[in-house]
């Protein structure tokens, strides 16, 4: 069981790393990125893929509650799907609470040449959260395919922010 989970995590990490590298390489340094305000604006825009995924998760949860009639989450009538989606939403918020400020701090502290990497990491993080959600719906072990890459993306942003502000 652990071997399967670890294997899925490694596959997800490899795919996310490759996607980050390819995407960053395809993004030109944005005009005006020498300005901290522009860099922060770009980093906020880079968070939109993850915010869109989170909004879809919340919308799905609301629709499931409406369709099932399980309006009171404290009544003990939540289906397995409602429980899974709630865990997905909770974990996404936990990871975003690390990723979002770290990405903004990295963008603010780094120079313009870092911005393609910042933007690409935002896209990869959002995609990884979507893979996590789909994986969890398939099987709890399959969530590792998206969980590992999104957490490593959060740690990468945090490390890059620390490095940018330590220089």
Language-model regions: role of each:
Residues 1-54:
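Long, highly hydrophobic alpha-helical transmembrane signal-anchor segments
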Residues 32, 56-80:
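Membrane-helix interface/capping segments
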Residues 48-64, 126-134:
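Transmembrane alpha-helical segments that form the membrane-embedded catalytic/substrate-channel core
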Residues 51, 90-104:
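Core segments of transmembrane alpha-helices
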Residues 105-133:
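Hydrophobic alpha-helical transmembrane segments and immediately flanking/interface helices
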Residues 130-155:
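Interfacial loop-to-transmembrane junctions
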Residues 158-167:
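Juxtamembrane boundary at the C-terminal end of a transmembrane helix
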């Amino acid at each position: 069981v652990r071997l399967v989970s670890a294997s899925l995590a490694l596959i997800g990490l490899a795919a996310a790393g490759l996607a980050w590298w390819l995407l960053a390489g395809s993004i030109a340094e944005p005009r005006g990125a020498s300005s901290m305000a522009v860099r922060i604006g770009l980093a906020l825009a880079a968070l939109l893929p993850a915010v869109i995924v989170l909004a879809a998760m919340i919308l799905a949860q609301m629709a499931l509650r409406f369709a099932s009639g399980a309006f009171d989450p404290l009544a003990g009538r939540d289906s397995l799907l409602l429980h899974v989606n709630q865990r997905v939403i909770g974990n996404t918020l936990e990871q975003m609470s690390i990723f979002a400020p770290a990405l903004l701090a990295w963008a603010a502290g780094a120079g313009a040449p870092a911005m393609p990497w910042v933007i690409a990491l935002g896209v990869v993080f959002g995609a990884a959260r979507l893979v996590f959600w789909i994986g969890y719906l398939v099987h709890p072990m399959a969530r590792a395919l998206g969980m590992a890459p999104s957490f490593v993306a959060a740690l990468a942003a945090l490390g890059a922010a620390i490095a940018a502000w330590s220089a």
